[in-house]
Amino acid sequence: MSTPSPAAAPSREEWLAKARTLSEALPFMRRYAGRTVVVKYGGHAMGDESLGRRFANDIVLMKQMGISPVVVHGGGPQIGQMLERLKIKSEFVDGLRVTDKETVEIAEMVLSGSINKQIVALINDAGGDAVGLSGKDDDLIEARKVTRSKRDPDSNIEKVIDLGFVGDPFRVNPGLLHKLQQADIIPVIAPIGIGEDGQTYNINADTAAGAIAAAVNATRLLLLTDVAGVLDKQKRLIPEMSVEAAQRAIDDGTATGGMIPKIETCLRAVNGGVEAAVILDGRVPHAIVLELFTEGGAGTLIGRK
């Protein structure tokens, strides 16, 4: 039986390439040191074990470089899978899941009790110190009920559609996050909010991340998605957009479907004080590192010129 040959040592060229990469990253490390970056973790990357480990490594790397990461995660597909297992049908309006009392309890169970703990474990296994939270902890995310209206084609009357316990953040109380950051702990937040009446609300993870980014005065909001970023009408990636250009992309139909609410989240965050927001492909290994620490970045950056 032949023994496996040892892996070849890196060549001089490979070492030089790594040195150039580190040299390129240095000014970006200085730029972000001591600043907060909010990362929304979602999409198919959450279902890929290898990408999940790489994501956790990137979060720990950010922390080791002096950045204060805050993670907000989604979990729509996992909620859908649990509802299917329980034989509960899902209904959507404008991409939002109609959420009755039973469904919001299941959503909280999946988001806070399962997904959140898995992400915390991944970060801790990678050498970080993470703690799981939901928006209900210390009234972190106060939410109000979301409503939608649709015009009836027969009567031409606008009808209000009750989405149940779906909420939008109206206030973020970041005191708990500041305490965790001062203790060098990485917060991992499930997008569950609490209403003025104590009711639990399911919140879109992008929306929650944007509100948190504004509340903690983050330097960056990173939305990990399943697309490369904002595409022009020829399906080419737009690497950078001003606030005005991003709004035009919505108005003129360049942005369509699920990209519209993501751009709107970025606009609210930037208008709320975040320096820039980036929509990037979470399926790309180390997308966060590419965005933060390389000249070319990754995805589409939306900010004020």
Curated annotation (Swiss-Prot):
Q: Where is this site: Transition state stabilizer?
A: 40, 262
Q: Which reaction does it catalyse?
A: N-acetyl-L-glutamate + ATP = N-acetyl-L-glutamyl 5-phosphate + ADP
Q: Which domain of life is it from?
A: Bacteria
Q: What is its EC number?
A: 2.7.2.8
Compartment annotation: Cytoplasm
Q: Which GO terms describe its biological process?
A: arginine biosynthetic process via ornithine; L-arginine biosynthetic process
Per UniProt, the keywords (alphabetical) are: Amino-acid biosynthesis, Arginine biosynthesis, ATP-binding, Cytoplasm, Kinase, Nucleotide-binding, Transferase
**Part of which pathway?**
Amino-acid biosynthesis; L-arginine biosynthesis; N(2)-acetyl-L-ornithine from L-glutamate: step 2/4
Any single GO molecular-function term of the entry would be:
ATP binding
Q: Which residues bind substrate?
A: 75-76, 97, 202
InterPro entries reported in the protein's UniProt record: AceGlu_kinase-like_sf, AcgluKinase_fam, ArgB, Asp/Glu/Uridylate_kinase, Glu/AcGlu_kinase, NAGK-C
Pull one GO CC term from this UniProt entry: cytoplasm
Family affiliation: Belongs to the acetylglutamate kinase family. ArgB subfamily.
User: Which HAMAP family does this UniProt record tie to the protein?
Assistant: ArgB
So what does this one do? Catalyzes the ATP-dependent phosphorylation of N-acetyl-L-glutamate.
The protein's name in its UniProt record:
Acetylglutamate kinase
